[in-house]
Amino acid sequence: MQIAVIENDMLFFKKTVKKGFERGLLPEYLTNDSLIRSYISKNKLEKIINSEFEISNKKYKKSINYKLLDTINKLANLDNKWKIYYLDSLSTYDSKNKDIYWKKYDSIISDIVDVKLIPLITKYGFPEERNIDLNYLGIKSLSNKPNYNYSFGNNKAKLILLHYYSYPRDKSYNQLLKNEVFKGNLQPEIYASIMDFQSKFSIIDEYYNEWHQTDDTTKFEAINKRRLEIGLLPFEEKNLKFKRGQKICKEKRENKNFKQVRLFYWCG
């Protein structure tokens, strides 16, 4: 949408708005963005936006698997509850028994993934925004000051798996998850991040250098081959773009120029 605004391409803008609403975006998400809000106001598109939302949102709601959504929400809440209790609280204040608490949480997250989450993925596909609800990811501003540090998606299953792979694990689910990438249910970046956690905390050495990274140059060729297989850029190119983006974002913040295409969800 932002690119359509920059290019002043009304046809493309309406097309992206329709696609966005069909994927779960709300009108307020558009007007929260200063660049898009100005374009809507300038071209008096408010009625068109609201009309398109009424039509497309019905299609979106019909596409949601509410039973799966409810189950994933419950699993995420269960994981979060016990992670906070055992890892973030008890293991911090009672460090002498840290190993006991880590093992206790390990048994809980293992049950959540092995017994509940994996069968759901096998049956329905990876539960992300494509088949369950899309969420606003970020902290909403409590003041009149605009907040640009947000994104959209559904990261609940992702977080569960990151917690799961923070312990030593084998490769039992690697192919299942990779197949979900090829099916379009799981973003390559998320799969690569999960595998990086597995590589960091297990004896398995199959880094993608998406989240955790190895500095061993002898492994770079194999890493980029794995990245290419799932549609990711070489990690060196990704890192260069990230650093270039950081520089641009810093300049935008210092100049307080927010009416530009956002490079990252945290880039105001």
Placement of each model-derived feature along the sequence:
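Short, composition-biased local secondary-structure segments
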Residues: M1-D9, E189-F197
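Preference for long, solvent-exposed alpha-helical segments and helix-linker "stalks"
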Residues: Q2-N154, L161-P168, L176, E180-F182
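Short coil/turn segments at secondary-structure boundaries
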Residues: N32, R130-Y136, E189-M195, K238-L240
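Stable alpha-helical elements in mature extracytoplasmic
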Residues: V113-K116, Y173, K219-R226
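Long amphipathic alpha-helical coiled-coil segments
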Residues: N185-L186
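A cross-kingdom marker for long, charged
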Residues: Y191-G268
